[in-house]
Amino acid sequence: MFLFDDILKGKIIIVGVGNTLRGDDGFGPALIEKLKKNFEEIGDRQYKSIPILIDAGNAPENYAGKIAKKKPDTILIVDAIDLGLKPGEYEIIKRTDMVETGFTTHNMSLSMFIEFLEKETGAEIYILGVQPKNVNLGEEISVSIQNTLDEISRLIFGQLF
């Protein structure tokens, strides 16, 4: 498993993927929102690197061209993915180590989106997959996922400071 200090290098784009109307599936967009608030609260302090934060919702393919034009060194895609773990547990997987899980609630297969970015940017691509508890329509993010959201936000923010 990778650590954030291993992967958050150079020009960074963090992409939150997920549907905020489906409980824990909204983890990716919720993390982006939390990170944006963290950076706004700190203001003009010096960071090692300020990432570009993109809430891609449930249509990451709509942002593929925009991401490619930014020519990042590192792309971290954050999504709720059924990894067979306990709810709230997560893994960071390098693109080259990724095995197609077959799980996505999005219009374009996550692996196709990632393949496009890999070809167009040459960036190191990582997937931060969080095990959801509940992805039912109309549900809120579960407590276990909220706790993970807080933890990951602190880890990312701390690494970039």
Q: What do the PLM-derived regions correspond to, one by one?
A:
Residues 1-133, 139-151, 155-161:
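N-terminal catalytic or cofactor-binding beta/alpha core of small enzyme domains
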